[in-house]
């Protein structure tokens, strides 16, 4: 049987809501030293518990229909944090475009304790201050993960806000943006005139295509105010820190929704009642 989206009724609004973020994190504690070691796994996801107000039967019928058509956890619906339906930022268009400015599948990097990353090529030629890069393949795990660029020193060198471990000529490193595991987005404005900020606490919806009406594939919370680099006669470049980590790569050119972003949700129980 095909899985389909069932549109949620829009009224009345919920009288109470609790919004939660779930992670899969393993932890071990040494019985001898008390030292802890954690391992974060791929799973991340939102959940919500909501309460509707009392309503007359004519209105409640719409919700009953919706609940039954979901068929337990079989079908899905679009949903967002009921207490944050309008973003606080001033960005003045409905969506942004995903565009990686750094994307290298294999390169040699040198990491220094002054928090600089040196490449043996020119991979940072298009990077801008505020960009988030995602590194994998470094021998020292401290150097892997998402790093925010604070200075573009040269086409082959950047300074990041993270604390790095010293490593020389670390080969087979990947330096990418908008990929699975990253906690930051590399974007550009949707038009040459679009501008404005994306605020901490705003939500963004990663969409499945370059259409503003396409189905979302992940809902993200903004954790650092956006950085915007003006482009004369072109689309401004925008960088923003987000959580949770991306569950999948974002295709270049696909849209990230700013106005009324939503995620995909399912019922947690196969029993519905009223």
Predicted regions and their residues:
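Small/polar beta-strand repeat architecture
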Residues: 3-11, 18-19, 89, 94-129, ...
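Glycine-rich, often proline-containing surface loops adjacent to acidic residues and nearby aromatics
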Residues: 43-49, 179-186
């Amino acid at each position: 049987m095909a899985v389909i989206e069932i549109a949620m009724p829009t009224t009345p609004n919920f009288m109470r809501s609790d919004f939660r973020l779930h992670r899969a994190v393993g932890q071990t504690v040494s019985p001898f030293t008390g030292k802890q070691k954690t391992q974060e796994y791929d799973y991340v996801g939102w959940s919500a518990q909501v309460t509707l107000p009392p309503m007359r039967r004519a209105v409640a019928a719409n919700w009953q229909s919706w609940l039954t058509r979901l068929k337990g956890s079989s079908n899905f619906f679009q949903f967002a944090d009921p207490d944050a339906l309008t973003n606080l930022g001033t960005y003045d268009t409905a969506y942004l475009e995903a565009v990686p400015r750094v994307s290298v599948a294999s390169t040699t990097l040198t990491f220094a304790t002054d928090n600089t990353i040196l490449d043996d090529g020119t991979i940072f030629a298009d990077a801008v201050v505020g960009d988030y890069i995602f590194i994998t393949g470094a021998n020292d795990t401290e150097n892997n993960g998402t790093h925010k660029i604070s200075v573009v020193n040269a086409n082959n060198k950047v300074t990041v806000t993270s604390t790095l471990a010293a490593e020389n000529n670390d080969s087979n490193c990947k330096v990418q943006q908008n990929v699975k595991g990253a906690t930051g987005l590399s974007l550009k404005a949707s038009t040459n005139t679009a501008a404005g900020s994306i605020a901490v606490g705003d939500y963004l919806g990663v969409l499945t295509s370059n259409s503003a009406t396409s189905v979302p594939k992940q809902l993200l919370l903004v954790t650092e105010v956006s950085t915007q680099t003006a482009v004369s006669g072109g689309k401004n470049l925008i960088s923003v820190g987000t959580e949770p980590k991306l569950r999948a790569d974002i295709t270049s050119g696909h849209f990230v929704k700013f106005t009324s972003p939503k995620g995909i949700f399912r019922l947690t129980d196969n029993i519905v009642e009223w």
